[in-house]
């Protein structure tokens, strides 16, 4: 069984039929019609499978399977949107999908990384979060926070 998450920038795959399943990534611009999967999710998922599962459902089920905590928040910052799942006491508490204010944030973060040649593992965390209500409008705060040597 081949699973696929067909995002705008990257597509992620996992072949559960292999002896040691390992995920792999392909830039979405390199996808061709031969990239058919058993079950798909993501922005372009319906183009590559007859069985499509909503991204919030996939995020919630994956969190249940992979996270041993009763209380957690999952955040998926994608190229076109931001999704979150919140579990409390082992039960789904809340979920959301922002494709307006969150639009392009993942892509913008990736552009910043490439433009400034950043290693996000090396950057210090800010003392406090940015006080913005819109990701696109908050870009100036992010640019200000990136200090280039």
Enumerate the language-model features and the residues they cover.
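Conserved phosphate-binding catalytic cores of ATP/NTP-utilizing and phosphoryl-transfer enzymes
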Residues: 49-90
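N-terminal glycine/serine-rich phosphate-binding loop of ATP-dependent small-molecule kinases
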Residues: 1-61, 71
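Membrane-embedded alpha-helical core segments of multi-pass
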Residues: 8, 79-82, 112
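Structural signal for hydrophobic packing residues in well-ordered secondary-structure cores
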Residues: 67, 71, 113-116, 146-149
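Electropositive phosphate-/nucleotide-binding environments in soluble metabolic enzymes
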Residues: 7, 53, 57, 102-106, ...
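Acidic-glycine-rich active-site phosphate/pyrophosphate-binding loop
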Residues: 39-43, 78-88, 135-140
């Amino acid at each position: 069984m081949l699973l696929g998450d067909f995002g705008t920038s990257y597509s992620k795959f996992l072949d559960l039929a292999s002896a040691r399943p390992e995920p792999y990534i392909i830039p979405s611009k390199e996808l061709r019609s031969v990239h058919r999967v058993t079950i798909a999710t993501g922005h372009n998922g319906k183009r590559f499978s007859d069985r499509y599962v909503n991204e919030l459902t996939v995020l919630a089920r994956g969190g249940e399977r992979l996270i041993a905590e009763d209380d957690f928040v999952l955040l998926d910052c994608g190229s076109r949107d931001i999704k979150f799942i919140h579990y409390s006491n082992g039960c789904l508490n809340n979920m959301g999908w922002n494709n307006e204010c969150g639009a392009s944030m993942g892509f913008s973060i990736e552009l910043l990384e490439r433009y400034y040649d950043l290693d996000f593992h090396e950057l210090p965390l800010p003392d406090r979060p940015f006080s913005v209500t819109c990701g696109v409008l908050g870009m100036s705060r992010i640019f200000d926070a990136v200090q280039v040597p």
